[in-house]
Amino acid sequence: MTYPNLLDRFLTYVKVNTRSDEHSTTTPSTQSQVDFATNVLIPEMKRVGLQNVYYLPNGFAIGTLPANDPSLTRKIGFISHMDTADFNAEGVNPQVIENYDGGVIELGNSGFKLDPADFKSLEKYPGQTLITTDGTTLLGADDKSGIAEIMTAIEYLTAHPEIKHCEIRVGFGPDEEIGVGANKFDAEDFDVDFAYTVDGGPLGELQYETFSAAGAELHFQGRNVHPGTAKGQMVNALQLAIDFHNQLPENDRPELTEGYQGFYHLMDVTGSVEEARASYIIRDFEKDAFEARKASMQSIADKMNEELGSDRVTLNLTDQYYNMKEVIEKDMTPITIAKAVMEDLGITPIIEPIRGGTDGSKISFMGIPTPNIFAGGENMHGRFEYVSLQTMERAVDTIIGIVAYKG
């Protein structure tokens, strides 16, 4: 189905810079997210028909569409995030390519282009309307496409009371891209049976498995002396960092893994002979494998300290989120419903693990099973990001189908 306000709504959203800041100590991490929620989203939530609309100190804008059929007793939530990834988001100037011809798309005057030879996903979209960047910023389809789709679904349901639906709760939140947005989510206040994050990629994505994730911070204490007299005295902290890294499995890196394979990812190394630091992220799907990865890093640190004769390697591990499959597989109702709705709409569900996490990873462990459905974005987090308007329309169709489902 086509929705006349969907495109303009999306374009309005992406032009607002809501980039999050991982170094911030506030919630939300940037004032621009507060302003976007209070000045743009809250008024529009009220305009499209949501009731009891409010903004919480945790950065979430919340609203409710009451059920219009007493036989539909479920309460279902839909959640998308306001922030965008760590890439230039100032001056977003989207291009709208109608009836895409399947060829190369020049991204404004930036010199960058979307070429099917480089981005095979473009082969799915001839004849569709694509929204791209101008090559100088990201687009923000992750996840403003999700926000626009949820808002449009509510608008349509309000205008069409003949479509019977259950109670719907909507939540637009901050800081998903920096991994802390759901930390303060109020599950008791949201009060639904289950929810969906509308934060996926291409048409048909339906996901209920995520990585389990941890961060590892390492400190290496060296001993600096003049290199001319260093033998037997110097301990090079940078060399310790190299030695530690070289004891990790050589092929367990993001660029060499796929599917259900986990990894260690070295994110940053800084330091000198005297002192060095390294930051890793650890990812795996199965709980035992996840715990084994953390234990392996600790074992390497312990072994190095034993060989060095002092505690020169310090490891701090912090769990970040867990595979929501552990929660959702106890009651697959949200997956069963979404799958049935997609199939009724002629959409082939793509049920694959997310090689990452969503707000739903944390919210699921707060007591609200929250799988993820497609929002349409491709090549997210950079200048080559784009989205199909037709895929966004199908996401709206899916949301409407879920809340009207009577099975």
Curated annotation (Swiss-Prot):
It comes from the Bacteria. Its cofactor is Zn(2+). Zn(2+) 1 binds at H81, D142, D199. Its EC number is 3.4.11.4. The active site is at D83, E176. GO terms for biological process: peptide catabolic process; proteolysis. It catalyses: Release of the N-terminal residue from a tripeptide. It is an enzyme of class 3 (hydrolase). Binds 2 Zn(2+) ions per subunit. One of its GO terms (molecular function) is zinc ion binding. It is found in: Cytoplasm. It holds the Pfam family Peptidase_M20. InterPro entries: ArgE/DapE_CS, Bact_exopeptidase_dim_dom, Peptidase_M20, Peptidase_M20_dimer, Peptidase_M20B. Zn(2+) 2 binds at D142, E177, H381. PROSITE patterns: ARGE_DAPE_CPG2_1 (PS00758), ARGE_DAPE_CPG2_2 (PS00759). Keywords: Aminopeptidase, Cytoplasm, Hydrolase, Metal-binding, Metalloprotease, Protease, Zinc. Its main location: cytoplasm. GO terms for cellular component: cytosol. Belongs to the peptidase M20B family. Cleaves the N-terminal amino acid of tripeptides. This is Peptidase T. It comes from Streptococcus pneumoniae serotype 4 (strain ATCC BAA-334 / TIGR4).
